[in-house]
């Protein structure tokens, strides 16, 4: 590997309960000590994915001061609090604060589900270096093709048949992968069902 990505963005309750993922943001002193050691001893490039805090918006400014100290390759920001999960609207103003405070490349993550949503975000935050698309791809495996079609006239929007083919290929690949690493059909089916059950979306 040439790069390590530290995930401080996962809001899952089971992860946060162990002070991992976004749970680490709740102990900023320990986080800073951890990053001090990692950046001192790790020979690889390091990027970080982060939320903007655990419970309150005023947690973001102290976190930015911590991130200012370290020569990270990239900071990937999902501008929601951990307690918000994936609900509500991303706090774009928090990303704008990072643009002012940090010198490292910044990547935006969160609620990119269509060409229109990407355009809105880029219009409000024109200084974004890159974007990361996560759950939007799980919801719509054809999203990348739709984004390409929206950005250039040489790429056509996928037809219904093409979208269905992509979905089937995605589903088959995912099912096969789960079957290889999980024990029993029940566990495999549970993981697959999470993709298609909106009430269980936060468990992904």
Predicted regions, residues:
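C-terminal helical cap(s) of enzyme catalytic domains, especially alpha/beta-barrels
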Residues: 140-155
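Alpha/beta enzyme core
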Residues: 1-4, 8-13, 18, 30, ...
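Glycine-rich beta-to-alpha transition loops that act as phosphate-gripper elements at the mouths
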Residues: 50-56, 107-116, 135-137
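Catalytic cores of alpha/beta
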Residues: 58-63, 112-129
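Glycine-rich phosphate-binding active-site loops on the catalytic face of alpha/beta enzymes
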Residues: 8, 79, 127-144
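Long, well-ordered amphipathic alpha-helical subdomains in the mid-to-C-terminal portions
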Residues: 164-195
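Short glycine-enriched, charge-decorated loop/helix-capping segments at active-site entrances
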Residues: 19-25
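Conserved small/polar residues in nucleotide/adenosyl-binding loops
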Residues: 196-203
């Amino acid at each position: 590997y040439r790069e390590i990505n530290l995930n401080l963005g996962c809001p899952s309750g089971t992860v946060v309960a162990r002070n991992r993922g976004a749970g680490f943001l709740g102990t900023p002193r320990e986080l800073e000590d951890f990053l001090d050691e990692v950046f001192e001893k790790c020979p690889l490039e390091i990027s970080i994915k982060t939320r903007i805090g655990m419970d309150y918006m005023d947690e973001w400014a102290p976190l930015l001061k911590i991130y200012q100290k370290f020569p990270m390759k990239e900071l990937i920001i999902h501008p929601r609090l951990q307690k918000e999960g994936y609900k509500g609207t991303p706090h774009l103003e928090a990303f704008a604060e990072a643009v002012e405070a940090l010198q490292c490349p910044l990547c935006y993550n969160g609620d990119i589900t269509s060409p229109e949503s990407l355009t809105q975000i880029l219009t409000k935050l024109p200084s974004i270096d890159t974007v990361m698309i996560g759950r939007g791809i799980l919801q719509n495996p054809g999203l990348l093709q739709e984004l390409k079609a929206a950005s250039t006239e040489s790429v056509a929007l996928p037809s219904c048949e093409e979208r269905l083919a992509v979905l089937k290929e995605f589903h088959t690949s995912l099912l096969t992968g789960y079957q290889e690493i999980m024990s029993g059909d029940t566990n495999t089916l549970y993981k697959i069902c999470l993709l298609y059950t909106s009430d269980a979306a936060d468990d992904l």
